[in-house]
Curated annotation (Swiss-Prot):
Segments for region (Disordered): 242-420
Entry similarity comment: Belongs to the Luc7 family.
A Pfam family hit: LUC7
GO molecular function: mRNA binding
Protein name as catalogued: Putative RNA-binding protein Alsin2
The keyword Secreted belongs to this UniProt entry's keyword annotation: no
Any Gene Ontology biological process: mRNA splice site recognition
GO terms for cellular component: precatalytic spliceosome; U1 snRNP; U2-type prespliceosome
The keyword Repeat is assigned to this record: no
Keyword set, alphabetical order: Coiled coil
Length: 420
């Protein structure tokens, strides 16, 4: 029985312990979700889910997509005494998928080292493997001796330390043979190898403390626990699975369906989810770009024409929306053209009215005095500075100078033209 997590509060720990001991019906109420529900993690019921074993490590898989509840485990343990649910078969398939992905990463790391590191001869490679083997054995025994010392078994820990001293002497001899079999410059380079259990990198020059930390670490021990549990399940669950298939209780179709609903862990599934996420993001971006109106930015007709095949190539939806955007651009162009024509007609009318007024005042000014002529010029210059609305009822005055009697006359020509 596993203990509750230390990160939980005291109340949560007591609640979890009661659930684990008494099951889901400890309060007398029936829960809708049962341990037999497909949403419940069957590997968790057997205490071998990789999401829990590798939690808070470098290979942390995050939260399991299925439900983990200690109360379900208690219900399963009590119900499994009277009935066989064959959950060990599903847990075995789960761990097989996980270990297969781990082995794939190990092979990939080995291939990467083979491409980056210098190729060694068969004799030198054999000596290097001997050094690595002794170093791994020392690290494992040292980690075990530390665990025994913490548990209070001092005598067993001292016996392991004696064995470690013998292995260290063998390692020193093997390192000397490895050093003399290759050039000094090549020996100084860091030679790495991949751990067969957790696919981590190990160096040939790592000291005993570094190796003990690795082999006694949570990551390596977690992978070791998963592999040992898989070996145990394959001994018991694999024959049961073959027997079910032989008797017809488990058809091939049910086996394939369970394979489709298998837990996805590791690099392949993460890569697949990443590809799906990127494709969906690109599709959403294309839809937003299609709905958004894009300005022309002053480009000519040749540049706009060159973009039409690109829009059509992006997808049928953008190709269908392209004529609509062109229609909206035409409407904006027509509106601007009409506005410019109206402004041009207004300027022409104002210029024509100004010429008519200058001709009228010049004829009436005749051979009169110069003072009246200058006053008319000042009035006309001030009238041009005013807007048409301000000028339409303007009273033009005329002083005939020597030829007129100085009478005031009003001109209604601009008002009549404006009303037209």
């Amino acid at each position: 029985m596993s203990a509750p997590s230390n990160k939980m509060s005291a109340t949560d720990q007591m609640r979890a312990m009661l659930d684990q001991l008494m099951g889901t019906t400890r309060n007398g109420d029936e829960r809708q979700l049962k341990f037999s529900d497909p949403r419940v993690c069957k590997s968790f019921l057997l205490d071998c889910c990789p999401h829990d074993i590798l939690a808070s490590t470098r290979m942390d898989l995050g939260e399991c997509p299925k439900v983990h509840d200690l109360a379900f485990r208690a219900d399963y343990e009590s119900a499994a005494k009277t009935r066989d649910y064959y959950y060990d078969i599903e847990a075995m398939e789960h761990l097989q998928a996980f270990i297969a992905d781990c082995d794939r990463r190990t092979d990939s790391a080995k291939q990467r080292l083979k491409e980056t590191q210098e190729e060694l001869t068969a004799e030198v490679a054999e000596k290097a493997n001997a050094v690595h083997g002794l170093a791994e054995e020392i690290g494992k025994k040292l980690a075990k001796a530390e665990a025994l010392g913490e548990a209070g078994e001092v005598e067993d820990s001292m016996e392991l330390m004696k064995e470690i001293e013998e292995l260290r002497a063998k390692k020193i001899k093997a390192e000397h043979e490895y050093r003399t079999s290759m050039p000094a410059s090549t020996y100084q380079q860091q030679k790495l190898r991949v751990c067969e259990v957790c696919s981590a990198y190990l160096g040939i020059h790592d000291n005993d403390i570094r190796l003990a930390d690795h082999f006694g670490g949570k990551l390596h021990l977690g992978f070791l626990t998963i592999r040992e549990k898989l070996i145990e399940l394959e001994k018991t669950a694999a024959p049961r699975k073959a027997e079910l298939k032989r008797t017809g209780k488990m058809t091939d179709r049910e086996d394939e369906g369970r394979g489709r609903n298998r837990y996805f862990v590791g690099g392949r599934e993460l890569d697949r989810r990443s590809r799906v996420h990127r494709s969906r993001s690109r599709e959403r971006q294309r839809n937003r770009d299609g709905d958004r109106e894009r300005p022309n930015n002053g480009r000519g007709p040749e540049e706009k024409g060159s973009e039409r095949p690109k829009e059509a190539a992006d997808g049928p939806e953008r190709a269908e929306r392209a004529p609509d955007r062109g229609g909206r651009r035409d409407d904006r162009d027509n509106h601007g053209r009409d506005h410019r024509e109206r402004e041009r007609d207004g300027r022409r009318d104002r210029d024509r009215h100004g010429r008519n007024d200058r001709g009228r005042f010049g004829d009436r000014g005749g051979g009169g005095g110069g003072g009246g002529h200058h006053r008319d010029d000042r009035r006309r210059s001030r009238s041009r500075e005013r807007s048409p609305r301000e000028r339409r009822n303007f009273n033009h005055f005329r002083d005939g100078g020597g030829g007129g009697n100085g009478q005031r006359k009003r001109s209604y020509s601009r008002e009549r033209n404006y009303r037209r």
